[in-house]
Swiss-Prot record:
Annotated glycosylation sites: N110
Gene3D superfamilies recorded: Immunoglobulins, MHC class I-like antigen recognition-like
Name recorded for this polypeptide: Saoe class I histocompatibility antigen, C alpha chain
Residue ranges with Polar residues bias: 346-359
Quaternary data: Heterodimer of an alpha chain and a beta chain (beta-2-microglobulin).
């Protein structure tokens, strides 16, 4: 397997950001790429996306009419042409390398070229509140399974199987971990700091979730309570259900946090309860945008303030009023037509021909 050279981006900085600068919480920059073979349909497709925290900021697609790294966030659009030329060059080089890697892995696993295969690659760095490296990443997967990964010490590799051990030996001989460590501790950290500074209005904001609980009957004896958190940023959030103060994690259905398409996220957690015991359950929400954890429960819809019999009586009265108005209108029209020498039946035929005039007249009454 060909050794992937680390992405060495030139620091296009007039002055390096201070190491002592701080940010609220930890932050990350990750690049994700996928290479998919297409037997009989041309070269494999290569797609690469970059994220700062939960926000995509760059994207490359080898199938584009003019393949190049493109901005996906407003703050990165201000980078100069040198940045985009270098990013595009690196992505094209990675695409070519992974095409070779696909062929190599077919040999390692004794597979036919007739099938579809994928290589996934993820690398990046996490930054602490003090602006220093927390963790570096560099890992591969083949056909959806772990292949090889750089360990937390950034000096050694973990191979998932015998085929990956071949790559591990090659990379150990070439001292590939040293180059990757230099990138993660240097270039990756510096660019993440730069993105956090340039995109701070978007990346360092905290939008609290909008929360509510919905009630869904399952049977005559059970119902599902679903706790919703909508429109929050960043994506990290905790939803838990409690019954009389005790966590219900084992009985709770929890979906993955999902993007809403407008730069925020949504999530829900559900629990099945016995009908009549809904009041015993509370949903607890923790998020960076909330000053303190928030607790809510399902509130049954309020009862109507007017009794049912009262509503029936009111409707009966309204019906009588409308009926009286219609009768009065008919009698008035009959008298009017008699004065003109016409008949009531002629007037009725004339009204029906005008379509909605009767309804319009009735509404006015």
């Amino acid at each position: 397997m060909t050794i992937m050279a680390p992405r060495t981006l030139l620091l296009l900085l007039s002055g390096a950001l201070s190491v002592t600068e701080t940010w609220a919480g930890s932050h990350s920059m990750r690049y994700f790429s996928t290479t998919v073979s297409r037997p009989g349909r041309g070269e494999p497709r290569y797609i690469e996306v970059g994220y700062v925290d939960d926000t995509q900021f760059v994207r490359f697609d080898s199938d584009a009419a003019s393949p190049r790294m493109e901005p996906r966030a407003p703050w990165v659009e201000q980078e100069g042409p040198e940045y985009w030329v270098l990013q595009t060059r690196n992505s094209k080089a990675s695409a070519q390398t992974f095409r070779v890697n696909l062929q190599t892995l077919l040999g390692y696993y004794n597979q036919s070229e007739a099938g579809f295969h994928t290589i996934q690659w993820m690398y990046g760095c996490d930054l602490g509140p003090d602006g220093r490296l927390l963790r570096g990443y560099h890992q591969y997967a083949y056909d959806g399974k772990d292949y090889i990964a750089l360990n937390e010490d950034l000096r050694s590799w973990t191979a998932a199987d015998a085929a990956a051990q071949i790559t591990q030996r090659k990379w150990a001989e070439a001292n590939a971990a040293e180059g990757m460590r230099a990138y993660l501790e240097g270039t990756c950290v510096e660019w993440l700091r730069r993105h956090l500074e340039n995109g701070k209005e978007m990346l360092q904001r905290a939008e609290p979730p909008k929360t509510h609980v919905t009630h869904h009957p399952v049977s005559d004896h059970e119902a599902t309570l679903r706790c919703w958190a909508l429109g929050f940023y960043p994506a990290e959030i905790t939803l838990t259900w409690q019954r009389d103060g005790e966590d219900q994690a084992q009985d709770m259905e929890l979906v993955e946090t999902r993007p809403t398409g407008n730069g925020t996220f949504q999530k829900w957690a559900a629990v099945v309860v016995l009908s009549g015991e809904e009041h015993k359950y509370t949903c607890h929400v923790q998020h960076e945008g909330l000053p303190e954890p928030f607790t809510l429960r399902w509130e049954p819809p309020s009862q109507p303030t007017i009794p049912i019999m009262g509503i029936v009586a009111i409707l009966a009265i309204l019906g009588a009023v409308v009926t009286g108005a219609v009768v009065a209108a008919v009698m008035w029209r009959k008298k009017s037509s008699d004065k003109k020498g016409g008949s009531y039946s002629q007037a009725a035929r004339s009204d029906s021909a005008q379509g909605s005039d009767v309804s319009l007249t009735a509404c006015k009454v």
